[in-house]
């Protein structure tokens, strides 16, 4: 037999030198050859993702979410979402999506009153003026933010015992204590291990990568880094709204798909007729649809990923 000896002059039972690293099918992985799953054993490219930024907020990514993953989210998740007008972009986008293409009305159906219905994603949608992280950041007597205390009270109610996903949105993120937001979120994560708390950044204000303390950009940087470092789920409003559909970065964008004199979302719509859906998106021009379209795509990506972890 023509076998290759290892450094000790012996071979294993398969005729392979003992100093090679071989998977169970006899395929070397450490040298860049894929195993039976197509992923090298020492490769990190398959690490789980937790952040829904601009790269996830596209129809291509959305349509590639397996139907089984969507159904898993509908079967497993009971979501509570607290927000005011800017936060409504998630729900508005999800509602508009149902009228987009054949089958979307069924596959991506959801409730908003917190009453579970078979075949629909269960969401308790708490939408009212001032019901957001920006307004309710005041620190109360126990040392926690108002929104935190309201969350604890909400979860203590017997009728909310099934809630296993919860998130709050910002209104204008500028000028607020974003580290306190992170700290209070982490306290909730510690105290309610069976609930997935989803972080959010706020919309851009057209002031670019402002170095001003607690600007929208600084909030984005701080919150995103925390989520990336700690495997926390995040819907990154700032990231989504400062990127065009082709991935071009517009750091000076506002919350309406406009950077200076460039209406990059409307321009994309003009050149891509039929590739977006209508919705009444808060704080945008009536005919600018992509801001809420992208929130729907990002949200469904998040829901599917959370269900995968449940």
Describe every region a protein language model picked out.
Residues 75-78, 103-106, 160-166, 190-198, ...:
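Loop/turn elements at helix/coil->beta-strand transitions in domains of secreted/extracellular proteins
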Residues 1-46:
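Ser/Thr/Gly/Pro-rich low-complexity, disordered linker/stalk segments of secreted
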Residues 255-310:
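Histidine-centered active-site loop/cap adjacent to the catalytic His
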Residues 142-182, 203-205:
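Oxyanion-hole/transition-state-stabilizing segment in secreted/luminal serine hydrolases
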Residues 77-81, 170-175, 208-213, 285-291:
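Second-shell loop/turn segments in exported
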Residues 51-156, 294, 298-300, 304-306:
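N-terminal carbohydrate-binding/catalytic regions of secreted carbohydrate-active enzymes
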Residues 91-95, 152, 167, 178-186, ...:
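Extracytoplasmic/secreted envelope proteins and their assembly/folding machinery
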